A protein has these predicted regions:
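N-terminal active-site segment of His-dependent metallophosphoesterases
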Residues: 1-58, 166-169, 173-177, 195
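Active-site neighborhood of phospho(di)ester-bond hydrolases with catalytic His/Asp-centered motifs
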Residues: 5-6, 42-47, 71-77, 112-113, ...
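Catalytic metal-binding/acid-base residues of hydrolase active sites
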Residues: 9, 48-49, 77-80, 116-117, ...
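Metal-dependent catalytic neighborhoods of phosphoester/phosphodiester hydrolases
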Residues: 15-16, 46-66, 75, 80-92, ...
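Polar/charged alpha-helical tracts
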Residues: 25, 29, 58, 62-66, ...
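Short amphipathic alpha-helical segments and helix-helix/interface helices
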Residues: 32, 60-65, 96, 160
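A general structural motif
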Residues: 37-39, 68-70, 107, 125-126
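Conserved beta-sheet core of the metallophosphoesterase superfamily
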Residues: 87-195
């Protein structure tokens, strides 16, 4: 089973989002409740945590090593991944990835990026963008509005090459979103969220 989550920010405290280290404990508990070890794959769409100093890296290694599943990191704006101890905790580290995930007997092409992208690979052929980065900010509201505007634009039947294309679908998998509830989610859960 594949799971998706972004913006865990382990080791970061933040007054803006009222985030304390208790969030780390909550995410870890939720993660290990749903993810099976050595069976499930978790795609972490960036900003996994605070890295840099030796102390920060040790804390991050400690947390990540206790999380179940095979971990694939899609790099965000906070990942330098210079520390070999951190890198070895992931089966793959990449800035962008396209995969196929199955839900309800259908294969779905997914584009995984930390950053929201207005135009992504095969979006008008039904591919789905999963992203993070924008948390629950005005940037996220703007991006959702942009996707809605784009879908309205492509309803114009006079546009060449875009007739009968499905609407663009993009989902923010930031852990702090209410439907994510600090828990890695399956594609089924994400699609049913209506986010």
């Amino acid at each position: 089973m594949n799971y998706y989550i972004a913006d865990t920010h382990f080791g970061c405290t933040n007054k803006y989002e009222d985030r304390t280290l208790e969030h780390d404990k909550l995410i870890k508990e939720n993660w290990n409740r749903v993810v099976r070890n050595n069976v499930d794959t978790v795609y972490i769409l960036g900003d996994i945590g605070r890295e840099g100093s030796n102390k920060d890296n040790e804390y991050l290694c400690e947390i990540i090593s206790t999380l179940r599943g095979r971990k694939v990191l899609i790099q965000g704006n906070h990942e330098g991944m210079k520390d070999a101890r951190l890198r070895q905790l992931f089966v793959e580290i990449t800035p962008y990835k396209e995969i196929i995930d199955n839900y309800n007997g259908l294969n779905h092409r997914l584009v995984l990026s930390h950053f929201p992208i207005l135009f992504w690979a095969s979006q008008h052929k039904g591919s789905i963008l999963l992203h993070g980065h924008t948390h629950m900010t005005d940037e996220q509201k703007f991006f959702k509005k942009s996707i809605n505007d784009l879908n309205e634009f492509f309803k114009d039947k006079t546009l060449k090459g875009y007739t009968d294309c499905p609407p663009a679908r993009a989902f923010n998998v930031g852990c702090m979103l209410p439907y994510m509830n600090y828990t890695p989610r399956t594609l089924k859960e994400i699609l049913k969220s209506g986010e």
